């Protein structure tokens, strides 16, 4: 588990992992019973793979947890974004561009944690940093000259249904609905 930020409690990573474990237990229990083994984990045909607003698919544990979250909350569009990404909708590119209504998270909505592991790659002798993508291209012999330090980071995302996108950016919302219509 991650290192606590304070002496009083668990880290953001620990909280996210606890939430994920609780969700798995809850879903497993909901499927138990007389005919539980016949029930699918997810309602068939209702959801596609979760993505961020830019269209990049989530993977691994994040994808599984976001699918469970969508199923539990009844979200029809599995698209997620951080608070900062929502705020980017409110930035205009030009000074004389007309200000559109502000995009925001709906009052009372809560974010959902996703976790991302990033890697810092440092040359053992020169202490020079290189990008993870560049490190992966090195030969095994060249890789031995570097130390790799993983870092687990937690981000908090909102489903697009938790925002006012439908009301203030109807053209964008229509594109999302078309993408996920069945």
Question: What spans do the regions from the language model cover?
Answer:
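N-terminal accessory/interface modules of nucleic-acid-binding and processing proteins
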Residues: 1-182
